[in-house]
Each structure stands twice: as C-alpha cells, then as structure tokens.
C-alpha cells in the first residue's frame, strides 16, 4: 500500500474506493493495535501501582477508557492514535487532579521505563507539555512488531467525575456546575468526559465515520505534513466535530450521502471559519443557571467557537492556526476530489444553528420563531410585522442576565450581539414622536416603554404601574443618580431614545 496516497489526485466520485483501499484499517494492523493496548492496560491494572505508595496512599485503577480514533471507531490504516484514560482513586475532585497530576505522571513514567521489557514492545516514553503548563499526559511511542509503523498512545490520568455511565446517559447538571466552578484551564479536565466524547462519535453511522476518516487523512497528510508536527494548528477533534455538524445540517443526519459532497461541505466551513459557532445540548444544556450563564458567556467569545459536546469549558476553536487551515481548505476545493460536486449538489450548512427567539409583547401571548443568527435583524422584524400586523415602527430589545437592555439594530445580525442561543426579545410599536426608554427594576431586569417626549415623569410612572409595576406614588425614578420630578417632561429633562431610567420602589 502507498503510505501517502494522493487525495488531491483522486476524483470526488472515486473517494469511496480511495477510502476502502487506502484508509480503512486492515485486520492485522487493528489486531496489533489492540494487542498493544491490552498489554499496556494490563500493566496499569496489575503492575504499575502494586506495592507502591503514591501521594501517601495506595492507588487503585477505577477504570480504563479508550479514547482517540481507536475508541471512536475512526482509525486510519497504519496511523493509530489511542488515548488511554486512567481513572485513579487518588483523584477525588477536579482540584485534586490539578494539584497532583504532575506527580502522578512522573510516577507512571518511572514505572513504565522500569517495567517496559515486560510489555513485549519497544516503547519510548515522552512527556507531553503544552507551553509552560504542567504536563497532563504521557505519550508512548510504541514500535510495531510486524512493520515500521508506530502506534502512538497518550496516557491521561483523570478524576472519575462521571462514575458508572451508560451510552445514553446524561450527566447530572451538578457535575458540570462543579466543573465550571473549579475554574481550570479551558478543557483541562476533558479526559474525565472521554466516555461521552467517545459515545458522541462511536454511535454515528458507518458512512459518517468514513467521512471522518477522510477529513482526518486530509488533516494529517495535506495539512499537518505541510506545516510540520510542531506547528500550532487546531486539533483533529475540532475538525471531527465540524464534520459531524456539517453532516447533521447538510443531510438531516441521514446515513445516505455522497462522500465528495460531505467533504466539500467541511472544506467550505473551514474556509469560513471566522463565522463558525457550534455547540450541542446532548450532555449539558441551558436549564441549570450556572451552566446557562457560562454557556452564554462562551458563545459570546471570539469565533470560531466549537464547544466540546461533553465539556463546555473546552472550546476547540480557541487554538491558533485557523488561517493555515482555511488556506489549505480553499486550495483543496480547487482539486479534483472536490470539483465533481456541482452547485445544486452542495449541502446547505449554516455557520451556526438557527436561534430560537421568543417574541414578547405586553398584553399578548408569547410567540416563537427561529432565525439564522447571521441573517439581518430587519428580516426578523419583517416576519414579526407580518405575524402581528404592525403598522408603526418596530423597536425590539433584549437583555442578558446581569447585563443592560439593548436595542437590536435592523442593520445588524444576532451574531453581531453574540446571540447564538435561545433569547427573549421585547417588541414595542412606536409612532412619531414617541421614543423608547428602558426602565431598570430593582432586581436588575429592564423593561422597555414607549412614551411621548412631552409626557411627564408621572405619565411614565403610570405606564410602569399599568405594566404590573409598583403604584406610581411608591416609585422613585433616577437618571444619572438624580431623582426625576413628577411634573417635569422627558423633553425638559433631555431624556433621549433608549436611555435607561432606574426605578426604586419606596416602601413606607
């Protein structure tokens, strides 16, 4: 077999043949990888910690989980990456893992070197370090006994945060709340969620796994090989998640599609990486307050945003090197492996999922619509106008927890405001010369009101009372820390459109 088959010289309609004959792992390679795994796993379970004290205690291996491409079922022939996650009894929390992981890794390294002869493989032990941070894994370079190929294996000691878990289990929100409160480096505790990462990929159709293999091969042979092993590039896992997203959006999760169409869809996403904002709610969602606030903050960050479906702290888009990836993807789209896909055959893959918008208007039932976060807000306004038969000017606003109420501009998009998840908007209809003012209640929530500039502060207080607020005589309104008198008009006070007025309720 050609060790470096030429993807760019392979016509798109021949990619299935290319994958079957060049990328699918052969039986002997899979068997050797499994044998190496079993021997090293046995060493950790039976030898590594036996008759030794570590951190002044006897250490027990709670469970061993296979991650990486081998664990997910997306291995390439003669190119293996296996992640061995060791869940150890010496870690009882994320914080304890962070404190003691370097000591544990150093201990494991010494034991591996000392006992390597018993493993029947020639093994070189490397410490994997990211910048100045303490290492979180060991890398084993395992020499194949039958070929010149190398089996790469990462050993990652981890805290067993999930406990026993089945394929379809959803972790308790408290686990993610604890993860977020631990304030570790983003993604630092992802190994604790390897089982979820593996299930997320392993349960997918075979055809999708083949597309994942194709994208991974492109990453290794057309990208990583070009820039070198030491270059800082997005992880393979980031591209893996992008591929799954493209498939979900482009085929509605069908297991019947053409490989070249899927490959082109992924390359097009990579070219437009600056607009990517992707997340899933399979294992965590917006119901828990701590998790919700954290997720909304994550989704407001710099793009690309690709949140690990198993670990919300792990944004795979944060790494550098996307410019190089986009340039290579643009070049790839010009090669024969992609040019067989015509315009009508291309998948419709948005750079972010549609956002659920709940439309609120005083005195009416809430209404829900879905919109592309990159679509101009004027289009959403037009849809609201048709639904509600509005004749005046539409003023729509939103407020995030802990933030100020903001008016949404027709010329912008929800993405411009960092809105990529479910949002409530308040709709008001104004007629000249009315203006919009925001009234901030004692709890921090703001409400919009329309009012004529010639109206008085007392008129505004009565509007607040009519909307369910305190009685007008119990209200004190402030602007720039100065109390507003009842008989003064908004025009006299120079209150402008979209100004925020503070409401204080006076209790006798």
From Swiss-Prot:
ATP binds at residues 69, 213, 216. The keyword DNA-binding does not apply. Its EC number is 2.7.7.84. Strongly expressed in spleen dendritic cells, whereas, in bone marrow-derived dendritic cells, the amount increases during the maturation process. Expressed in many organs, the highest levels being in thymus, lung, and bone marrow. Keywords: Antiviral defense, ATP-binding, Immunity, Innate immunity, Magnesium, Metal-binding, Nucleotide-binding, Nucleotidyltransferase, RNA-binding, Transferase. Disulfide bonds: none annotated. Gene3D superfamilies: 2'-5'-oligoadenylate synthetase 1, domain 2 (1.10.1410.20), Beta Polymerase, domain 2 (3.30.460.10), Phosphatidylinositol 3-kinase Catalytic Subunit, Chain A, domain 1 (3.10.20.90). InterPro entries: 2-5-oligoAdlate_synth_1_dom2/C (IPR018952), 2-5OAS_C_CS (IPR006117), 2-5OAS_N_CS (IPR043518), NT_2-5OAS_ClassI-CCAase (IPR006116), NT_sf (IPR043519), Ubiquitin-like_dom (IPR000626), Ubiquitin-like_domsf (IPR029071). It comes from the Eukaryota. Produced as a latent enzyme which is activated by dsRNA generated during the course of viral infection. The dsRNA activator must be at least 15 nucleotides long, and no modification of the 2'-hydroxyl group is tolerated. ssRNA or dsDNA do not act as activators. Its cofactor is Mg(2+). Belongs to the 2-5A synthase family. PROSITE patterns: 25A_SYNTH_1, 25A_SYNTH_2, 25A_SYNTH_3, UBIQUITIN_2. Residues 435-473 form the Ubiquitin-like domain. PANTHER family: 2'-5'-OLIGOADENYLATE SYNTHASE-LIKE PROTEIN 2, 2-5 OLIGOADENYLATE SYNTHETASE. One of its GO terms (biological process) is interleukin-27-mediated signaling pathway. It catalyses: 3 ATP = 5'-triphosphoadenylyl-(2'->5')-adenylyl-(2'->5')-adenosine + 2 diphosphate. The gene is Oasl2. Interferon-induced, dsRNA-activated antiviral enzyme which plays a critical role in cellular innate antiviral response. Synthesizes oligomers of 2'-5'-oligoadenylates (2-5A) from ATP which then bind to the inactive monomeric form of ribonuclease L (RNase L) leading to its dimerization and subsequent activation. Activation of RNase L leads to degradation of cellular as well as viral RNA, resulting in the inhibition of protein synthesis, thus terminating viral replication. This is 2'-5'-oligoadenylate synthase-like protein 2. CDD domains: NT_2-5OAS_ClassI-CCAase, Ubl1_OASL. GO terms for molecular function: 2'-5'-oligoadenylate synthetase activity; ATP binding; double-stranded RNA binding; metal ion binding. Mg(2+) binds at residues 81, 83, 154.
């Amino acid at each position: 077999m050609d060790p470096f088959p030429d993807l760019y010289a392979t016509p798109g309609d021949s990619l299935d043949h290319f994958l079957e004959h060049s990328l699918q792992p052969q039986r002997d390679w899979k068997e050797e990888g499994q044998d190496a795994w079993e021997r090293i796993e046995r060493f950790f379970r039976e030898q590594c910690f036996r008759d030794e004290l570590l951190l002044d205690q006897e250490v027990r291996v709670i469970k061993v989980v296979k991650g990486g491409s081998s664990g997910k079922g997306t291995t390439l022939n003669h190119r293996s990456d296996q992640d061995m996650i060791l869940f150890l009894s010496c870690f009882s929390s994320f914080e304890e893992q962070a404190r003691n992981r370097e000591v544990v890794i150093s201990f494991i390294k010494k034991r591996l070197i000392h006992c390597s002869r018993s493993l029947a493989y020639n093994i070189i032990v490397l410490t994997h370090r990211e910048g100045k941070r303490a290492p979180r894994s060991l890398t084993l370079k395992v020499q194949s006994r039958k070929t010149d190929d190398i089996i790469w294996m990462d050993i990652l000691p981890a805290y067993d945060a999930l406990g026993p878990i089945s394929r379809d289990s959803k972790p308790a929100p408290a686990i993610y709340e604890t993860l977020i409160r631990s304030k570790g480096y983003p993604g630092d505790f992802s190994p604790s969620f390897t089982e979820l990462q593996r299930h997320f990929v392993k349960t997918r159709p075979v055809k999708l796994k083949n597309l994942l293999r194709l994208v991974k091969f492109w990453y290794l042979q057309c990208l990583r090989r070009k820039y070198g092993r030491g270059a800082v590039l997005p992880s393979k896992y980031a591209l893996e998640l992008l591929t799954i997203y493209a498939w979900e959006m482009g085929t509605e999760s069908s297991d019947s599609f053409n490989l070249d169409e899927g490959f082109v869809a992924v390359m097009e996403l990579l070219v437009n990486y600056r607009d990517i904002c992707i997340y899933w709610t399979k294992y965590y969602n917006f119901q828990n307050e701590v998790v919700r606030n954290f997720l909304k903050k994550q989704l407001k960050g710099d793009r690309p945003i690709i949140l690990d479906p198993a670990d919300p702290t792990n944004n795979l888009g944060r790494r550098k090197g996307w410019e190089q990836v986009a340039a290579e993807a643009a070049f790839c789209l010009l090669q024969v492996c992609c040019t067989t896909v015509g315009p009508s055959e291309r998948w419709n893959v948005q750079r972010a999922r549609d956002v659920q918008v709940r439309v609120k208007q005083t005195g009416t039932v809430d209404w829900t619509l879905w919109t592309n976060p990159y679509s101009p807000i004027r289009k959403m306004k037009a849809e609201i106008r048709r639904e509600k038969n509005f004749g005046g000017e539409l003023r729509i606003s939103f407020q995030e927890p802990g933030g100020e109420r903001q008016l949404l501009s027709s010329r912008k998009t929800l993405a411009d405001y960092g809105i990529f998840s479910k949002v409530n908007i308040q709709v008001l209809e104004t007629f000249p010369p009315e203006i919009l003012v925001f009234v901030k209640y004692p709890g921090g929530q703001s409400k919009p009101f329309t009012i004529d500039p010639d109206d008085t502060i007392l008129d505004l207080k009565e509007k607040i009372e009519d909307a369910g607020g305190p009685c007008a005589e119990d209200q004190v309104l402030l602007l720039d820390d100065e109390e507003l008198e009842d008989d003064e008009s908004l025009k006299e006070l120079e209150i402008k459109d979209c100004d925020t007025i503070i409401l204080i309720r006076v209790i006798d």
